């Protein structure tokens, strides 16, 4: 089996790691960075990912997509999506199936399709390092992701050409990375994971028994729409309102200006983690009839903290729930680990330390721990890592809608996965010949307040008084946290099974079409890369030849010079085109024509060497080395 890589597919940044011997190793991308910005830009004929996409965002805001993880597996009507529509510079649109999709360059795309571009870059980074094709991956998701979001993440992997061997929760992955080299006694750790768009808290017990480490998740909780992007947005709104007070102009109507403000806010937020004050200075941010306008706003750490304090406090509520669910008190937590870039904010660190009554550990890299843990799990699945057992849990309860619009739970939240549960139900009316099984995920008793995962019918039930037929419903939850449901009529043996495909979500046909499109683009991207390489070689050849013509001077016969210049002109005519073969052919012709230049250059070099040898002075045998001391006039 080939290497199974570990990928942290983040809202703001993504990271890829691989097991190097026994140690997880974070890999650098083509730009030499250990994390890749989860930003995708669509330009004329090219798709940019990471830093190249981020760099051009100011001039191309409508076609530069970021924080797509906030949309993955979500419906357009979701309250969180509606909030994002107001603040995102790109278009969020409603798909035919009701999902939240995005639009760029006039093309509508599903969130998994866009996220697949980031996964493709992670895959390529690993392949460049390993020198072989990579197909297997462990991809992490927020612990509090529901079934639809997990399924959509797997779909993104498939579109990127990856076989997602396992979906694991981000805090659990971080605990794996942290605990792997801690071979001491048992410990109970709290992983507080505040990333770019999501927040999780997991309470995990690490046991060491006879050399085997067991990582058991006791409880998990969180908020899939709370993260660094929300902190950025608070600061963006403050900067925009300050500018409006001063200049009377609302920048929210200007996408280019808003993109600049977004970048400046993100930078200021990061600076305020180490400085007490920073200046947000944006010259020529916009203009009106009176001329150009500049933004210059001083932001103190105290001001930023006042803007986001409620967000930090909001993150503490899930901590209380997770502790209660695991039947533990704060005193029983051995270590606190902070994961996610937003945990670098001093206020976050202080509030978490205050809650747990202890400082968080400093020996965990908040940006890399999750990918490293995913690589460890990849090693476990590939058989390269022995003596490590991971027991994760489902973050939310699963059940079905029963009479009166009630949700009846079959699998409770924080149940260790994989797991299976069944329960027998009956009909609500006399002579009922079919039942609809409506599958739900959530914690509310009222069915409508929970997430609908889908529904299916069991037909052909024999007529009988209500309450008589015996219908056995079985829930089978796999290690990825994805649900399979079956319903069986015990009297007839008729059975209906489904893998939960939410009322939204991508169908297999849609995913396959996207895989084919990605493959086609892969070939197109390769051809484009080859074309650019050919153009660059042509440029170098022209520049080098022109330089040699100058150096050759009169030594180059006029007819040869004419021949070479004609070859240069022919190459210049084709090098801007899209015909790689023509560029290669004309480059070759120029090389042939420039043979005379090579001969002249060699002759000159040989003549120079001969001259240098003749000019060397004869050593006088009577000369004696002496040391001189400089005498200065007094």
UniProtKB/Swiss-Prot annotation:
Pfam families: HSP70. PROSITE patterns: HSP70_1, HSP70_2, HSP70_3. The keyword Chaperone applies. GO terms for molecular function: ATP binding; ATP-dependent protein folding chaperone; unfolded protein binding. Residues 601-613 have a biased composition (Low complexity). CDD domains: ASKHA_NBD_HSP70_DnaK-like (cd10234). Induction: By stress conditions e.g. heat shock. Residues 601-634 are annotated as: Disordered. Keywords: ATP-binding, Chaperone, Nucleotide-binding, Phosphoprotein, Stress response. The modification Phosphothreonine is found at residue 198. Belongs to the heat shock protein 70 family. Acts as a chaperone. This is Chaperone protein DnaK. It comes from Aliivibrio fischeri (strain MJ11). The lineage of its organism: Bacteria, Pseudomonadati, Pseudomonadota, Gammaproteobacteria, Vibrionales.
């Amino acid at each position: 089996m080939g290497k199974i890589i570990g990928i942290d597919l983040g809202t703001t940044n993504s990271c890829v790691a691989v097991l190097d011997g026994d140690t997880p190793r974070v890999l650098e991308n083509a730009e030499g960075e250990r994390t890749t910005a989860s930003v995708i830009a669509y330009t004329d004929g090219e798709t940019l990912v990471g830093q190249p996409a981020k760099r051009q965002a100011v001039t191309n805001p409508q076609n530069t997509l970021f924080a797509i993880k906030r949309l993955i597996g979500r419906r357009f009507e979701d309250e969180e999506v509606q909030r994002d529509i107001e603040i995102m510079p790109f278009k969020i649109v409603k798909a035919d199936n009701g999902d939240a999709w995005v639009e760029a360059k006039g093309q509508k795309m599903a969130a998994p399709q866009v996220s697949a571009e980031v996964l493709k870059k992670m895959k390529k980074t690993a392949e460049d390092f390993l020198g072989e094709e990579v197909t297997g991956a462990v991809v992490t998701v927020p612990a509090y992701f529901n079934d639809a979001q997990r399924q959509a993440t797997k779909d993104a992997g498939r579109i990127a050409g990856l076989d997602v061997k396992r979906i694991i929760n981000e805090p659990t992955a971080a605990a794996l990375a942290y605990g792997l080299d801690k071979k001491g006694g048992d410990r109970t750790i709290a992983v507080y994971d505040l990333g770019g768009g999501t927040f999780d808290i997991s309470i995990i017990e690490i046991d060491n028994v006879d050399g085997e480490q067991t990582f058991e998740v006791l409880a998990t909780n969180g908020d899939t729409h709370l993260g660094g992007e929300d902190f950025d947005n608070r600061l963006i709104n403050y900067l925009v309102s300050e500018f409006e007070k001063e200049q009377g102009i609302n920048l929210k109507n200007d996408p280019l200006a808003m993109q600049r403000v977004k970048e400046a806010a993100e930078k200021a937020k990061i600076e305020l983690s180490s400085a007490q004050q920073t200046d947000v200075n944006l010259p020529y941010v916009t203009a009106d009839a009176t001329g150009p306008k500049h933004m210059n706003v001083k932001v103190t750490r105290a001001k930023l903290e006042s803007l986001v304090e409620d967000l930090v406090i909001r993150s503490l509520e899930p901590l209380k729930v997770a502790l209660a669910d695991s039947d533990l008190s704060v005193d029983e937590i051995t270590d606190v680990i902070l994961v996610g870039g937003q945990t670098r904010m001093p206020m976050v660190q202080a509030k978490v330390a205050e809650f747990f009554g202890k400082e968080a550990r400093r020996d965990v890299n908040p940006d890399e721990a999750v990918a490293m843990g995913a690589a460890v799990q990849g090693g476990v699945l590939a058989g390269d890592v022995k003596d490590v057992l991971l027991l994760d849990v489902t973050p939310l309860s699963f059940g079905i809608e029963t009479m009166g619009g009630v949700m009846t739970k079959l699998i409770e939240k924080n149940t260790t996965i994989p797991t299976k549960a069944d329960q027998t139900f009956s009909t609500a009316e006399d002579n009922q010949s079919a039942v609809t099984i409506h599958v739900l995920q959530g914690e509310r008793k009222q069915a409508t307040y929970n997430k609908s995962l889908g529904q299916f019918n069991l037909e052909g039930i024999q007529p009988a008084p209500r309450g008589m037929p015996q219908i056995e419903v079985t829930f089978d939850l796999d290690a990825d946290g994805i649900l399979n449901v079956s319903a069986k009529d015990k009297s007839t043996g008729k059975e209906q099974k489904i893998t939960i495909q939410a009322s939204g979500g991508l169908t297999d046909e849609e995913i396959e079409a996207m895989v084919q499109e990605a493959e086609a683009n892969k070939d197109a991207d390769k051809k484009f890369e080859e074309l650019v390489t050919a153009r660059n070689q042509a440029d170098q050849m022209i520049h080098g030849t022109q330089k040699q013509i100058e150096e050759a001077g009169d030594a180059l016969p006029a007819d040869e010079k004419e021949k070479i210049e004609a070859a240069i002109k022919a190459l210049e005519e084709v090098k801007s085109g899209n015909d790689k073969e023509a560029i290669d052919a004309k480059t070759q012709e120029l090389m042939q024509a420039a043979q005379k230049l090579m001969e002249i250059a060699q002759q000159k070099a040989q003549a120079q060497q001969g001259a240098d040898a003749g000019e060397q002075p004869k050593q006088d045998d009577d000369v004696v080395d002496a040391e001189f001391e400089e005498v200065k006039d007094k």
